[in-house]
């Protein structure tokens, strides 16, 4: 059994025959050649499909969807076709993710502008939405103005409330005015008594 196998394989390796040569066709006709025909096919498939390319193709196909290598057997695919498929799929995935991300960001920005606008119109200043407004510079300025207004209102309320514990200014003012008026009446009355007291006492009005 071992003698007919060696002379049949020796010229195939030495001459570098292809699949279409009659020497390899004769291998398939013999009973012993049927065993070596898969070896000859694997010999010619090694340079066409490297294991690294097949692994990359399998990983990309698992991540993106149904694998093309399972639907179509390996020997029927050309080496250039497999490389182009492997290169196109990651590129398409990147483009899809890029365009999809941009689309989602645009929709988010469009939808996020409406709640911010409605809150500003209704006057809901304290309950700020987590979404940003249409422009990136206006909302911070608006929030700063609102915060400044709230601080001024709080300071004015504290200033007005600080007088509640103190005595009322009206009562204090009237007391001082009464004291001053009493002193002035005393001065006038003493002067009137001095000048007109000699002639007669007249009721001071």
UniProtKB/Swiss-Prot annotation:
Q: Which UniProt keywords apply?
A: Apoptosis, Cytoplasm, Membrane, Methylation, Mitochondrion, Mitochondrion outer membrane, Phosphoprotein
Indicate where the modification Asymmetric dimethylarginine is found in the sequence. 132, 134
Where are residues bearing Phosphoserine located in the sequence? 67, 113, 129, 135, 137, 156, 171
What's a BP term from Gene Ontology annotated to this protein?
positive regulation of proteolysis
Q: Which domain of life is it from?
A: Eukaryota
Where is there biased composition of kind Polar residues?
Answer: 85-98
The protein's job, in short, is: Promotes cell death. Successfully competes for the binding to Bcl-X(L), Bcl-2 and Bcl-W, thereby affecting the level of heterodimerization of these proteins with BAX. Can reverse the death repressor activity of Bcl-X(L), but not that of Bcl-2. Appears to act as a link between growth factor receptor signaling and the apoptotic pathways.
| Official protein name in the record | Bcl2-associated agonist of cell death
Question: From which source organism is this entry?
Answer: Rattus norvegicus (Rat)
Q: Upper taxonomic classification of the species?
A: Eukaryota, Metazoa, Chordata, Craniata, Vertebrata
Corresponding gene? Answer: Bad
């Amino acid at each position: 059994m071992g003698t007919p196998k060696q002379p049949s394989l020796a010229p195939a390796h030495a001459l570098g025959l292809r699949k279409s040569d009659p020497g390899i066709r004769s291998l398939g006709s013999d009973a012993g050649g049927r065993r070596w025909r898969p070896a000859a096919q694997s010999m010619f498939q090694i340079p066409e499909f490297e294991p690294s390319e097949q692994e990359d193709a399998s990983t990309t196909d698992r991540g993106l969807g149904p694998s093309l290598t399972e639907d179509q057997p390996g020997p029927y695919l050309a080496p250039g076709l497999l490389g182009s498929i492997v290169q196109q799929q990651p590129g398409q995935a990147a483009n899809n993710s890029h365009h999809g991300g941009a689309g989602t960001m645009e929709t988010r920005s469009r939808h996020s502008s409406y709640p911010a606008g409605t809150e500003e119109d209704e006057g809901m200043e304290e309950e700020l939405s987590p979404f940003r407004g249409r422009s990136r510079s206006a909302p911070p300025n608006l929030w700063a103005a609102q915060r400044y207004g709230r601080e001024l209102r709080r300071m004015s309320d504290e200033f007005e409330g600080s007088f509640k514990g103190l005595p009322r200014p009206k009562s204090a003012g009237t007391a001082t005015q009464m004291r001053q008026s009493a002193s002035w009446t005393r001065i006038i009355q003493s002067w009137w008594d001095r000048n007109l007291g000699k002639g007669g006492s007249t009721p001071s009005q």
